[in-house]
């Protein structure tokens, strides 16, 4: 795998007499498919009605969640494997490795499952559990990596994939960041479908950008056929893909999955994009929910970003013109995220009134707070405590987690039994290693829900829907640990009193 950033290595220029060096393929759908891979491509184009009511132009959505694996990345997963087979690069029995935000991994794992390849996916921790579950069900091996790791760091999903590639015989990284099959899947497939479905009438097309293969492949074909068509790229705040560079604020994290990067992928040709629009998490998730509720489009969060960008960009179009927006993936991957009302509340993606109303419905705690639980002082460890010593404490007290604190008693992170077991079992850590090697770190740029002694038990109860325990702090110093059993004990005692 070459460095994932840098200019495109493609030397072919469209609209010249030069023959394309690329293999082109586009196969119409069969009435009875030989296998599920035949259901990749040929996705529907749907008119957007309610959400676009303020626009003069027509707005239509390319619904890529109708692909076999649920996203636009099924196209490139299939294309990369087929092209690698035909070139002789891979053969049956080989191992495929791919660093991905999830959807490309699902597309690859789907094709690998049908064709009989072993699949290893390296995946940042922020990606949804649903993606992990689907990948595992398809037979892929999953390795999670720190979300905050820079793309060129050895512990990043790209760095780990490269390391595995160097260690595993007959393994290959098909490399969505630099593989020409990525944009070609859209040049030959997605773009041709759009031109056919729209009968050659497209005035604007809006796509989000991750690796950039989708927007590059579509833009190349569209610009060849419709040179006056406006290509709009959508990039989340915190990513650096947009131009001009002044649009990009790198001192910000984002929860939208599958789009944006901290480097410029090789396959992304930004010169093909006429305009960039930046979006944030809140407006994107709210829009995704609107698309579900008002249009019946069961789409993911990045589709919300794309629609936000489309509604802004399409304001420049007039009556009789048409804007196409690409919706990249389905809600299936985010059932516990933006489809979940409580997740939206916890992350500040809904109006405060909703949260207040939700809290008022939980009258069973009668205004009680964490302080009313009368919790014992916590057992803590330092970052230099050995894994072996930590295990002894976990055994002694029957805990499954221990908070890690600094010399000044500030909370640094948490050691969990599950993470410790994973590291020891996979030999990523040994008993004499310090727990700093295996702990979850609480970083300043990560948003956490503070639990203090004044936190209401209603709020704590909601927190426990997604967490097994909470660290109670005051001024960043740990006061106690509270678990679900503490809350249950309080409820039972309260009922006995009444």
Swiss-Prot record:
<comment type="similarity">
    <text>Belongs to the cysteine synthase/cystathionine beta-synthase family.</text>
</comment>
<dbReference type="InterPro" id="IPR001926">
    <property type="entry name" value="TrpB-like_PALP"/>
</dbReference>
<feature type="compositionally biased region" description="Low complexity">
    <location>
        <begin position="11"/>
        <end position="22"/>
    </location>
</feature>
<dbReference type="GO" id="GO:0006535">
    <property type="term" value="P:cysteine biosynthetic process from serine"/>
</dbReference>
<feature type="binding site">
    <location>
        <position position="103"/>
    </location>
    <ligand>
        <name>pyridoxal 5'-phosphate</name>
    </ligand>
</feature>
<dbReference type="InterPro" id="IPR005857">
    <property type="entry name" value="Cysta_beta_synth"/>
</dbReference>
<dbReference type="GO" id="GO:0019343">
    <property type="term" value="P:cysteine biosynthetic process via cystathionine"/>
</dbReference>
<comment type="pathway">
    <text>Amino-acid biosynthesis; L-cysteine biosynthesis; L-cysteine from L-homocysteine and L-serine: step 1/2.</text>
</comment>
<dbReference type="Pfam" id="PF00291">
    <property type="entry name" value="PALP"/>
</dbReference>
<dbReference type="Pfam" id="PF00571">
    <property type="entry name" value="CBS"/>
</dbReference>
<dbReference type="GO" id="GO:0004122">
    <property type="term" value="F:cystathionine beta-synthase activity"/>
</dbReference>
<protein>
    <recommendedName>
        <fullName>Cystathionine beta-synthase</fullName>
        <ecNumber>4.2.1.22</ecNumber>
    </recommendedName>
</protein>
<dbReference type="InterPro" id="IPR036052">
    <property type="entry name" value="TrpB-like_PALP_sf"/>
</dbReference>
<feature type="modified residue" description="N6-(pyridoxal phosphate)lysine">
    <location>
        <position position="73"/>
    </location>
</feature>
<feature type="binding site">
    <location>
        <position position="302"/>
    </location>
    <ligand>
        <name>pyridoxal 5'-phosphate</name>
    </ligand>
</feature>
<keyword id="KW-0028">Amino-acid biosynthesis</keyword>
<dbReference type="InterPro" id="IPR050214">
    <property type="entry name" value="Cys_Synth/Cystath_Beta-Synth"/>
</dbReference>
<dbReference type="InterPro" id="IPR046342">
    <property type="entry name" value="CBS_dom_sf"/>
</dbReference>
<keyword id="KW-0456">Lyase</keyword>
<feature type="domain" description="CBS 1">
    <location>
        <begin position="374"/>
        <end position="430"/>
    </location>
</feature>
<keyword id="KW-0677">Repeat</keyword>
<dbReference type="InterPro" id="IPR000644">
    <property type="entry name" value="CBS_dom"/>
</dbReference>
<feature type="binding site">
    <location>
        <begin position="210"/>
        <end position="214"/>
    </location>
    <ligand>
        <name>pyridoxal 5'-phosphate</name>
    </ligand>
</feature>
<dbReference type="InterPro" id="IPR046353">
    <property type="entry name" value="CBS_C"/>
</dbReference>
<feature type="region of interest" description="Disordered">
    <location>
        <begin position="1"/>
        <end position="25"/>
    </location>
</feature>
<feature type="domain" description="CBS 2">
    <location>
        <begin position="435"/>
        <end position="497"/>
    </location>
</feature>
<dbReference type="InterPro" id="IPR001216">
    <property type="entry name" value="P-phosphate_BS"/>
</dbReference>
<keyword id="KW-0663">Pyridoxal phosphate</keyword>
<dbReference type="GO" id="GO:0005737">
    <property type="term" value="C:cytoplasm"/>
</dbReference>
<dbReference type="GO" id="GO:0006534">
    <property type="term" value="P:cysteine metabolic process"/>
</dbReference>
<keyword id="KW-0198">Cysteine biosynthesis</keyword>
<keyword id="KW-0129">CBS domain</keyword>
């Amino acid at each position: 795998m070459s460095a994932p950033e840098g200019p495109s290595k493609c030397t072919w220029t469209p609209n010249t007499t030069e023959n394309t060096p690329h293999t082109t393929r586009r196969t119409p759908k069969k009435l009875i498919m030989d296998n599920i891979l035949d259901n990749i491509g040929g996705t529907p184009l749907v008119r957007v009605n309610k959400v676009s009511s303020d626009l003069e132009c027509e707005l239509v959505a390319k619904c890529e969640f109708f692909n076999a694996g649920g996203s636009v990345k099924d196209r490139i997963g299939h294309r990369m494997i087929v092209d690698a087979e035909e070139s002789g690069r891979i053969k049956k029995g080989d191992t495929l490795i791919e660093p991905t935000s999830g959807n490309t991994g699902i597309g690859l794992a789907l094709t690998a499952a049908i064709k009989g390849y072993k699949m290893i996916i390296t995946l940042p921790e922020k990606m949804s559990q649903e993606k992990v579950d689907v990948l595992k069900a398809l037979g892929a091996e999953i390795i999670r990596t720190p979300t905050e790791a820079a793309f060129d760091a050895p512990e990043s999903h790209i760095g780990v994939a490269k390391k595995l590639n160097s260690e595993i015989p007959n393994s290959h990284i098909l490399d969505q960041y630099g593989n020409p099959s990525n944009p070609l899947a859209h040049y030959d497939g997605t773009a041709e479908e759009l031109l056919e479905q729209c009968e050659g009438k497209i005035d604007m097309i809006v796509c989000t950008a991750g690796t950039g293969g989708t927007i590059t492949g579509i833009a190349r074909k569209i610009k060849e056929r419709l040179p006056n068509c406006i290509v709009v790229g959508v990039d989340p705040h915190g990513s650096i893909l947009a131009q001009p560079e002044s649009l990009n604020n790198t001192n910000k994290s984002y929860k939208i999955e599958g789009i944006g990067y901290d480097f410029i992928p090789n396959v992304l040709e930004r010169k093909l994009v006429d305009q960039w629009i930046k979006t944030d998490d809140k407006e994107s998730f709210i829009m995704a929910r609107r698309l579900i509720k008002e249009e019946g489009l069961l789409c993911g969060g990045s589709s919300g970003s794309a629609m936000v960008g489309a509604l802004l960009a399409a304001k420049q179009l007039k009556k009789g013109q048409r804007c196409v927006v690409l919706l990249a993936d389905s809600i299936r991957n985010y059932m516990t995220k933006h489809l979940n009302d409580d997740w939206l509340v916890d992350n500040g993606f809904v109006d405060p009134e909703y949260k207040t109303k939700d809290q008022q419905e939980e009258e069973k705690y009668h205004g009680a707070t964490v302080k009313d639980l009368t919790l014992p002082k916590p057992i803590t460890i330092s970052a230099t405590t050995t894994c072996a010593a930590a295990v002894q404490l976990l055994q002694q007290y029957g805990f499954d987690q221990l908070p890690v604190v600094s010399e000044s008693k500030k909370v640094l992170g948490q050691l969990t039994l599950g993470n410790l077991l994973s590291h020891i079992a996979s030999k990523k850590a040994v008993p004499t290693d310090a727990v700093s090697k295996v702990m979850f770190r609480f970083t300043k740029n990560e948003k956490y829900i503070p639990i203090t002694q004044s936190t209401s038990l209603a709020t704590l109860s909601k927190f426990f829907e997604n967490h097994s325990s909470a660290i109670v702090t005051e001024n960043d110093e740990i006061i106690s640990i509270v678990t679900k059993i503490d809350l249950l004990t309080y409820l039972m005692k309260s009922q006995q009193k009444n």
